[in-house]
């Protein structure tokens, strides 16, 4: 089916150490009733071709939840952040466009893939487009062209791992979204997860009264 944009694969970035989660795999946590893996898969499966997880663990669990999921590790051992996951992806995916999404997002905007492609088309030099929600830039939530690989490799070789700085070199465009009452756009610690669930429960109680 013609979606109005080129074939695009999805890579879920789940290769971190999860120090502030006491080592728990955030992709397997339930933020909104379903595991993050299932939530992301269900929301985006109709918008992308193949779905991958960039992770160093729990492959069998991922595949028990989503049988056709594909997995890969970072090209280098150690934990170098999302830039390494993005660079490593191009050794595995077949598509020339990849939507990257962090494993800990709470909100996935409707039509996010189409809107990122639209943002990317605004500048012929652009090799990246990223999501902004309520004015907050979510650099790891982004669309990259395969041509971005050269810059990714150069930045990693120089140990310049900042996505913000890398994206400047890629002439990155932005897709802007608004979401009312979004207190956390991502969950980075067990404390944040507890707060997020408490706020969600309070809102559900309030909405029924």
Curated annotation (Swiss-Prot):
It comes from the Bacteria. It is found in: Cytoplasm. Pfam families: NTP_transf_3. GTP binds at residues 13-15, 26, 54, 74, 104. Its main location: cytoplasm. GO terms for molecular function: GTP binding; metal ion binding; molybdenum cofactor guanylyltransferase activity. The N-terminal domain determines nucleotide recognition and specific binding, while the C-terminal domain determines the specific binding to the target protein. Monomer. Transfers a GMP moiety from GTP to Mo-molybdopterin (Mo-MPT) cofactor (Moco or molybdenum cofactor) to form Mo-molybdopterin guanine dinucleotide (Mo-MGD) cofactor. Belongs to the MobA family. This is Molybdenum cofactor guanylyltransferase. The lineage of its organism: Bacteria, Pseudomonadati, Pseudomonadota, Gammaproteobacteria, Moraxellales.
């Amino acid at each position: 089916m013609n979606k109005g944009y080129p074939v695009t694969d999805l890579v879920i970035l789940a290769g971190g150490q999860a120090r502030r989660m006491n080592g728990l795999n955030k992709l397997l946590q339930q933020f909104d009733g379903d595991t993050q893996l299932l939530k992301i898969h269900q929301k985006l499966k109709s918008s992308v071709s193949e779905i991958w997880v960039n992770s160093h663990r729990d492959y069998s669990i991922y595949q028990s939840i989503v049988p056709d999921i594909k997995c890969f590790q970072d090209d280098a051992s150690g934990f170098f952040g999302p830039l390494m996951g993005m660079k490593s992806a191009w050794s595995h995916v077949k598509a020339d466009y990849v939507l990257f999404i962090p494993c800990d997002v709470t909100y996935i905007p409707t039509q996010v893939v189409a809107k990122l492609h639209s943002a990317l088309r605004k500048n012929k030099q652009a090799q990246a487009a990223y999501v902004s929600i309520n004015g907050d830039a979510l650099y790891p939530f982004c669309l990259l062209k395969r041509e971005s690989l050269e810059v990714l490799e150069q930045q990693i070789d120089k140990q310049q791992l900042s996505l913000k700085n890398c994206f400047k070199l890629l002439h990155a465009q932005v897709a802007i979204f608004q979401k009312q009452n979004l207190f956390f756009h991502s969950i980075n610690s067990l404390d944040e997860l507890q707060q997020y669930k408490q706020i969600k429960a309070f809102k559900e109680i309030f909405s029924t009264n």
